[in-house]
């Protein structure tokens, strides 16, 4: 599903895993979510390209093979690098897949993202 210029594919949702969820995410250069937080933990494993990531006050450039872990309720963001990128992400108990589906239905209107994500426990900063 497309969300604000990048793609998210649900590989496994909580109905299949008893809680955690797994996603494939990819996008062209410059795409990615703005700073946000949510109650669930999230980890990203970069497969290709580069991804500039911010977690709390730390910022790093993730290359293939890099794992980034984001504890729940921690502000974070990422932007796909110059050649775009691809990664696999996993969330702990939460409803990220439902939130992504709702965001995809918003026709990429970012002005609606805060209210939509808020219904799922996510807050944009």
Language-model regions, residue ranges each:
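A short, N-terminal "cap"/entry segment at the start of jelly-roll beta-barrel domains
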Residues: 1-19, 105-125
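Short acidic-glycine-tyrosine-enriched beta hairpin
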Residues: 16, 45, 50, 57-75
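Ligand-binding loop in jelly-roll beta-barrel domains
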Residues: 16, 52, 72-97
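Short glycine/proline-enriched turns and hinge-like loops at secondary-structure junctions
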Residues: 19, 37-39, 80-82
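A hydrophobic/aromatic-rich effector-binding and dimerization subdomain
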Residues: 90-110
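Conserved short histidine dyad/triad with adjacent acidic residue
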Residues: 8-10, 22-37
């Amino acid at each position: 599903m497309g969300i604000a210029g990048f793609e998210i594919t649900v590989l496994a949702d909580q109905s299949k895993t008893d809680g955690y969820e797994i996603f494939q995410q990819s996008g062209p250069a410059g795409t990615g979510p703005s700073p946000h937080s949510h109650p669930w933990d999230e980890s990203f494993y970069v497969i290709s390209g580069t991804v500039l990531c911010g977690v709390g006050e730390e910022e790093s450039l993730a290359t293939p093979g890099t794992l980034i872990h984001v504890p729940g309720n921690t502000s974070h963001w990422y932007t796909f690098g110059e050649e775009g990128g691809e990664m696999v992400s996993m969330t702990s108990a939460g409803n990220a897949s439902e939130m992504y589906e709702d965001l995809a239905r918003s026709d990429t209107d970012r002005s609606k993202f805060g209210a939509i994500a808020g219904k799922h426990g996510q807050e944009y900063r």
